[in-house]
A protein has these predicted regions:
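N-terminal, charge-rich alpha-helical recognition modules
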Residues: 1-111
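Amphipathic alpha-helical protein-protein interaction segments
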Residues: 106-137
């Protein structure tokens, strides 16, 4: 089940809401705000809690780089997330989040390889060799 109902993302003519969902992009009406582009969750001027889309994205996508589980968990459908992430107003934010996820995944992989090397398991020599070849140790 998604964090929000589909209706929260669709306007009266059936189009996906985009700018009105974000505090920083909705200029005249905060009725439909659900998210902030800030690093942490906040409360808007009317006392409504807004979730950090960046935080949600990083938490979900680090475990599934396809973004599918994130889309389903938050929006309930891939189409809504795809429309939001490809919107020109959000593209630069999305690119930075994607870059951070890629770095986080690499970091976790390197940590796992280093742990294998330290434990001296069957793959420890290969792990050590990889870390040395890549200049990570």
């Amino acid at each position: 089940m998604a964090l929000f109902e589909r209706e929260a993302f669709i306007n009266s003519v059936g189009h996906t809401r985009i700018k009105s969902l974000f505090l920083e992009l909705s200029y005249d009406n905060n009725k439909f705000q659900l998210f902030t582009l800030k690093d942490k969750d906040i409360v808007n001027s009317e006392g409504k809690p807004l979730l950090s889309i960046k935080k949600l994205y990083l938490d979900h996508v680090s475990n599934d780089p396809t973004e599918y589980t994130f889309a389903m968990a938050i929006f309930g459908t891939w189409d809504i997330w795809d429309t939001i992430r490809t919107n020109p107003s959000l593209r630069r934010y999305y690119s930075k989040w994607r870059e951070e996820v890629d770095v986080r995944i690499k970091s976790e992989a390197i940590r796992s390889i280093a742990e294998e090397m330290r434990e001296g398991g069957r793959s420890s020599f290969t792990a050590a060799k990889l870390l040395l070849e890549r200049g990570w140790i």
